[in-house]
Amino acid sequence: MNLNINMHISWLGGTTVKIVAKPFDEEVVIVIDPYKPAEGTAPRSLSPQVALFTRGSGDSITLSGEPFILDTPGECDIKGVLITSVAGTEGQTMIRLDAEGVSLAHLGLVNKSLNQKQREVLSDVDVLFVPVGGVNTYDAEDAVKAVNELEARVIIPIAHQSD
């Protein structure tokens, strides 16, 4: 099988992730959790076509243009990117993206075990963003449990303390 993958993934701090995919002829910029950090620096503004939030869309950094915003559970297809958002804990959501033959899951801020519905939607992904080592995040043992449950191929830690 010949895969031509043009996806770029950037961690911007906290739980913020920028994904640039090219499922068809046009790039799609997706930003997950573009929140203003309590401390440290973050981009002043971003220009995504899609902005996804795991904890509601309040307290966001400036988003230029008119991005499609999803901050509740649901499913949609935007420019060839399939987005599935499932209810998390305490009003939060968890997100799965499928584009260019690559699947990604973002757990947001979570420190509880995953339920059956979450495991169904988020399992067997290529890339998993796991919150670990920060406030309201998994400790190492629980992060390993979540990773093993979801059987991801690549793990990217997020929400950890960084300089």
Language model feature labels by segment:
Residues G134-T137, H160-D163:
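Short Gly/Pro-enriched loop/turn and capping motifs at secondary-structure junctions
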Residues M1-S47, S57-V127, V135-E141:
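Core dinuclear metal-dependent hydrolase active-site scaffold
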